[in-house]
Amino acid sequence: MPTLFAIYNLKDTQKAEEYHNYLIQTKIPGIRGTPWCTDFKTWKMDKVLGPAVSEPEGELPSEPPHQYIAKIEVSDLDAMLSFLGTNAGKEFVKSWSVYLDPTTIFTIGNEV
């Protein structure tokens, strides 16, 4: 089962509270309600705790490089991609794009 991650920041013009309401009311129920999604969770990165290596290079950033990470468990990647190509899928992505910085990326990974 593929796992997708969206790694992103909000646009400077967007407020976190408005985005959180959008997630709760629209995005999370919308994705969880699709036949190809088995799970969808989003995490907000709060702060940098410390280095993750014994000999870090340079100074630690004061803020996390990304504000959010979304994890989407996909049961049928072809069905998801097909949905994203429809008008409804394009509108779904467009509604999310209102909030997200244009450097947002999707990655696909698997558990190690």
Residue ranges and their predicted role:
Residues 1-112:
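Macromolecular interaction modules
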